[in-house]
Regions:
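Short, Lys/Arg-enriched N-terminal segments with co-localized hydrophobic residues
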Residues: 1-9
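Acidic/aromatic-lined carbohydrate-recognition and catalytic surfaces
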Residues: 11-238
Length: 238
């Protein structure tokens, strides 16, 4: 009886499933930019109360949102270049110079992978020192996963994106402290880049989510059922 009473007290409402990557964008894949805010406005105008998303994590080699390099990190592809231009981290010419794919109905993940990280590296070159205090706070708040994730991605990049079980350095494979200390120093620039990318991701996502919630719309998230074998989570907890 109590359960029935609780159900009758719930307000009937509806929403729409719209993955971030499906939003229109001049950058090859949907982002947290203008189209996301416009979709939130559309939901509000249509009387919808929920925006359902697919997982927001960084996709692995199969580009599936359900196979992610991290259960905690965000997908770098969703960082909007136009917002970075507005912050002074990129120029419009830099954002327009890269090829993002020619078919607006299909995501060319190959081109995005080739070009997105180079663009974000430009943003990091301008913003790392400028944002240092905020980055330090971000690192402290996310200390349980961010250091391992940033080093994991730097190592994957260094070892040609091979699964961590195939890395030629056995110490790095086994997450041994001495090896990790060596690689953290050796790959410092890349570790900083992957740290800064997460800083940018969550800054843009937090702003978008605040806007969505301000319209009276709730976000229904999603996560993979299991962590992926080739992920920072499994690597860091062997």
């Amino acid at each position: 009886m109590r359960c029935r009473e609780r159900w009758t007290e719930m307000e009937r409402s509806s929403g729409i499933l719209m993955p971030i990557f499906s939003l229109p964008s001049p950058y090859g894949v949907g982002t947290f930019g203008a189209a996301a805010y416009e979709f939130a406005d559309f939901l509000h105008a249509a009387g919808q109360r929920y925006w359902q998303l697919l997982p927001l994590g960084p996709t692995g080699c199969g580009d599936s949102p359900y196979q992610s390099f991290s259960a905690h990190a965000g997908n770098p592809y969703f960082i909007d270049p136009d917002l970075l231009i507005r912050e002074g981290l990129l120029t419009a010419e830099e954002a327009a110079a890269s090829a993002w794919g020619e078919n607006p109905r299909h995501v060319d993940y190959g081109k995005i992978y080739e070009n997105r990280f180079a663009l974000l590296a430009r943003a990091k070159a301008r913003g790392w020192e400028r944002d240092r205090a905020a980055i330090s706070d971000f690192e402290t708040e996310n200390g349980g996963w961010l250091p391992d994730y940033a080093l994991f991605m730097a190592l994957k990049q260094h070892f040609d994106m091979k699964p961590w079980t195939q890395w030629p350095d056995e110490g790095a494979q086994r997450h041994e402290a001495l090896s990790l200390s060596h690689w953290r120093a050796e790959l410092r620039e890349d570790v900083e880049l992957f740290t800064y990318i997460q800083f940018l991701f969550f800054r843009q996502w937090d702003a978008l989510k605040k806007y969505i919630n301000g319209l009276g719309i709730s976000v229904i998230g999603d996560i993979p059922v299991y962590v992926a074998m080739d992920s920072a989570d499994v690597w860091a907890e062997p």
